[in-house]
Amino acid sequence: MPRTTRRRLMVATAVITAATAAVAVTSAAGAFDSAQQAKNAIRSGKAKNVILLIGDGMGDSEITLARDYTVGANGRLNMDKFPLTGAYTTYAVHADGTPDYVTDSAASGTGWATGVKTVNGRISKTPGTDKAVKTILELAQKNGYATGSVTTSELTDATPAVLASHVTDRSCQGPADMAKCSTDTIAAGGPGSIAEQSVNHKVDVLIGGGKQRFDQTVTDGKYKGMTVTQQAQKLGYQVVTDSAGLKSAKSGKPVLGLLASGNVPVEWTGKAAAVGGTDPQRCVTSNPNRPATTPSLADSATKAIQLLEAKQKAAHSKQGFFLQIEGASIDKQDHAADPCGQIGETAAFDKAVKVARAYAAKHPDTLVVTTADHGHTSQIVPLEATPPGLSSTLVTDEGQQLKVNYSTNTPGLSQEHTGTEVRIAAQGPQAYRVLGVTNQTDLFTTIREALRLR
């Protein structure tokens, strides 16, 4: 064991010993009992499975806003209940390797997917030389693990894309979107668009939005003239589009779930923030524009776990699975300064966290990590404040008013990411590695070591 790893494990042991003692006291007062989780968290052995949960744009302000509104200031979300919590830095780099202090989702995702920092907009390629870098999903496949990706964005959006594609620019989502990726086209000898690469990689489970990208026609190569969806079917994929189809999907063949033309519709709605603020409002927790046949993120995550586990059992494999689950529209609603949409997506993501933790409770050889790719714009401010930008006043489940402000860009423009560090929390084998302040690229190492990927 390397000296730095041994030292971190010793520190983790001391922290957990103290935490376990504290839990023993607080449990009697009704607090959740995480003593056994705490003991398991310092395990340095191999994990059979890894479930990585990404709340896109879910900084501490976004978590606090969702907590305050849904469970109260003194309540706890599922993501608050992990035994080990740290923080990691999120910066990207310029082509020369110097820091770019505010990342986008492509560069941040590349960081944990490959262990390499890159420039904003690039998907799993180096910053200066634009060379493809092996991803954690590709390594997991090579080592015999089942793999999956579940998201509420288009499957070709940046965060899911970093796992199984390599393109110069994140906009190159389908065969018709390759203007910024001339060297990545199949005609130029490249691997093609993000959609084409995703199915060519034979990822076992792909569930999200983005049907419009997969409906585009392949322009070159073996599948020329087909849509990417038809290409996927040629490669053996079961293609499903709603809850019923997802429920009936079998584990014998890979699954491509295309649940929406674009991003999956959000769960909640309400008035967007406005210059000068809004009247106090309660969020509408059932979006009338979300089809009733659309599975929740938690339902999609549950099915993905079932499919991946069943595949490995049928193959009598000693290896388990790697699964990434993304709550993508926390970020998208932050960009739109829509607090109700944002809170609803955070709450939906938190239910997926509950699914992952419930699975890990029955399978303690599962490493579960939850984190964000970057911080975002929303801030809880005093009710009497008159901040610049866009504001909204909400009435929480506790019956209190809460003012949220968005001021990282001019009103009318998309609100911007922030360069802050973000939370990372974990349980299971190798979870101690998240303690302290780490780098986003360290998450790649944590997963690689947990699964013993070589």
Question: What is each of the regions a protein language model found here?
Answer:
Residues 44-49, 58-63, 68-110, 156-454:
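A post-motif C-terminal structural segment
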Residues 144-146, 363:
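Secondary-structure transition into beta-strands, especially the periplasmic turns and strand N-termini
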